[in-house]
Amino acid sequence: MSAVAENIQTGMPAPILFTDSAAAKVAQLIAEEGNPELKLRVFVQGGGCSGFQYGFTFDEITNEDDTTMTKNGVSLLIDAMSYQYLVGAEIDYKEDLQGAQFVIKNPNATTTCGCGSSFSA
């Protein structure tokens, strides 16, 4: 199955990859919360050692300027400001010896910090 999510607004493949692994983990977390209305919000904000950092939270509300994508029944929300920094990125979920975490591979990042949670563009 393709890792490309569908953009709800256009029905076209989204320019942000939301992997099967990430969608499955989000579905598991939503089930644990017991609220099927939850959506994963991914955002970029100022901070971190490289200037910007990624954030993840659950949200029930879709804002007017949000881009909404769906993958395997899971919805992903990205606000307009964050979207410009995330176009072309891959949102994945990895489990390895170092632990389990959501990972963003972002081609727009000119530098990243050692922890991988902040970047500059």
From Swiss-Prot:
On whether Iron-sulfur is a keyword of this UniProt record, the answer is yes
Q: Which amino acid positions bind iron-sulfur cluster, per UniProt?
A: C49, C113, C115
Q: Which domain of life is it from?
A: Bacteria
Question: What Pfam families would the database entry show?
Answer: Fe-S_biosyn
Example of a GO biological process term: iron-sulfur cluster assembly
**Keywords from the UniProt entry:** Iron, Iron-sulfur, Metal-binding
What task does this protein carry out? Required for insertion of 4Fe-4S clusters.
Task: Read off the PANTHER family from this record.
Answer: IRON-SULFUR CLUSTER ASSEMBLY 2 HOMOLOG, MITOCHONDRIAL
| UniProt similarity note | Belongs to the HesB/IscA family.
Report the protein name in the record.
Putative iron-sulfur cluster insertion protein ErpA
